[in-house]
Amino acid sequence: MASYEYVSPEQLAGFDKYKYSAVDTNPLSLYVMHPFWNTVVKVFPTWLAPNLITFSGFLLVVFNFLLLAYFDPDFYASAPGHKHVPDWVWIVVGILNFMAYTLDGVDGKQARRTNSSTPLGELFDHGLDSWSCVYFVVTVYSIFGRGSSGVSVFVLYLLLWVVLFSFILSHWEKYNTGILFLPWGYDISQVTISFVYIVTAVVGVEAWYEPFLFNFLYRDLFTAMIFGCALCVTLPMSLLNFFRSYKNNTLKHNSVYEAVVPFFSPCLLFILSTAWILLSPSDILELHPRVFYLMVGTAFANSTCQLIVCQMSSTRCPTLNWLLLPLFVIVMVVNVGVTPYVESILLFTLTAAFTLAHIHYGVRVVKQLSNHFHIYPFSLRKPNSDULGVEEKNIGL
């Protein structure tokens, strides 16, 4: 398994022909953030590899997740009568979230600035973004939490899926049209949430208990904004871009079946994970919501990364992700009946297995593409073909 190759020779050949094509029409991104990023990128030395910037931003997102997991493990810290998250934590999380967003915005500019743009860089960026979705959503949840003043863990589960499907829609579009239409919601949500974290530190979580307008609570506004943005903006725009490509006869997949294949694994993941929640004898989502979310988000990220590889290499997306097989088995076992202790062990084991499998997938794909393009993933130095494998082995790739 240590030398397993996930990227096929056909896909490697497809990467050689790949040309980046994206459309960004978001006014916030075009007129505010891009000028800001153009200034920030000048701070970085020209020897700094773009992938190192990307990975650093991802680590900040994970750190925020772990920080709030420590202070708010079960999402009760924001509820009345419970010990709240310290104000300084919200300030740290807000600053680091904006820093992560900034690093995600400047990595591509650093690549163009240093003339080091490669398909690996885009895959690395978007692959980590797919995993960041779950960390970002679950971290935001701590602002409201659950309880009388918050949102139930099942509603948050549904909100997580809305975000996940919104993310994969962009890459489904590109899989079919060849063009990545950058979603508006990403930039708006990152700036807004970074600000909300800081505001929470100033006014306290108690401020979110109060009605916003006409007895409309902030938690309801939070929920409505996510559902509304997905249903009224993200989904219609994706379908519009798809049908424009269909009308112009530029679709890359002519049959309906081939066009929707990328949705099979995510939909099966949704069905299986929801079935587990509904069939659980111990109400597993109530017991371990944070771990359950992480399990779902990691499995989703793995399927999304496979889609991105196929989309960039112009190859067919796998019909199903075999990573879902153990989840199917566990759902069947839970349906028969298990004790709460055993069910918890199954969840923690599966989450650990998904995480290790996804990390293995990522490391191996990065190594394959690094070897193929004769580059180092985290250095701008150009390796000799004879020593590339040796040095990567030394740094753990």
Swiss-Prot record:
EC number annotated for this UniProt entry: 2.7.8.1
Top EC class for this record: transferase
Keywords: Acetylation, Endoplasmic reticulum, Lipid biosynthesis, Lipid metabolism, Magnesium, Manganese, Membrane, Metal-binding, Phospholipid biosynthesis, Phospholipid metabolism, Selenocysteine, Transferase, Transmembrane, Transmembrane helix
Required cofactor(s): Mg(2+); Mn(2+)
Pathway it works in: Phospholipid metabolism; phosphatidylethanolamine biosynthesis; phosphatidylethanolamine from ethanolamine: step 3/3
PROSITE patterns attached to this UniProt entry: CDP_ALCOHOL_P_TRANSF (PS00379)
Compartment list: Endoplasmic reticulum membrane
Annotated TM spans: 47-69, 84-103, 123-145, 150-172, 179-201, 221-243, 256-278, 291-310, 317-339, 344-366
Catalytic activity: CDP-ethanolamine + a 1,2-diacyl-sn-glycerol = a 1,2-diacyl-sn-glycero-3-phosphoethanolamine + CMP + H(+); 1-O-alkyl-2-acyl-sn-glycerol + CDP-ethanolamine = a 1-O-alkyl-2-acyl-sn-glycero-3-phosphoethanolamine + CMP + H(+)
GO terms classed as biological process: ether lipid biosynthetic process; myelination; phosphatidylethanolamine biosynthetic process
The keyword Iron appears for this protein: no
Protein's membrane topology: Multi-pass membrane protein
Single GO term (MF): ethanolaminephosphotransferase activity
Any one Gene Ontology cellular component term annotated for this protein: endoplasmic reticulum membrane
Family: Belongs to the CDP-alcohol phosphatidyltransferase class-I family.
Protein name: Ethanolaminephosphotransferase 1
